[in-house]
Amino acid sequence: MSATTLLSYEGSITFDKIEQILTLFSQRMPETNCPVCKIRMFSIMVECLENAYRHNYNTPEQNPQISLELTSDENHYKLTIGNRASNIDIEKLTSSIDKFNKLSLSDIKALYNETIHAGHITEKGGAGLGLLKIMRCSREPIIYTTTATDQNSSFVNLSISITDPDKQ
């Protein structure tokens, strides 16, 4: 069975646009298919949109840009989101993803709790919980690709999937 596109967006990202995207998600995500999937995917979308906004590589005269697509098939929901980021940020991101993808769900939960209790806030205002929260909700590895845009930045795409627990 081929995937159905539930939501697609490409353009600038602001807090107002994040709110609009999340509202559209709530309207388009089927209520009856998998309520647990809807809750998990909503949490994943919030984290991904905030991260794409916060870690976007742009000049002061540019608005941050993203691409986003949410699809579903019989058993899965898949969010693909991309944005331009500094190569330094992407190196940290992909290193963390590679590390976290090797962990079990219980290890991810434990690391999440340790990170909360450590209380360290980064210079960008985060605590490093976003990826862990995404992985806790997804329960599947994050797939990523990067494409260089110039010497200092690249476009990074993340693909996050959720499998309907009733259809596993």
Language-model regions, residue ranges each:
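A short, charge-rich alpha-helical start-of-domain segment used by transcription regulators
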Residues: 15-22
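Short alpha-helical basic/polar micro-motif
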Residues: 46-47, 132
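Conserved short strand/loop->alpha-helix "switch" segment adjacent to the catalytic nucleotide/phosphoryl-transfer site
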Residues: 23-46, 116-124
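Conserved phosphate/oxyanion-binding catalytic-loop motifs
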Residues: 11, 15, 48
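Conserved beta-strand-loop-beta-strand hairpin that lines the nucleotide-binding pocket
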Residues: 1-6, 17, 54-168
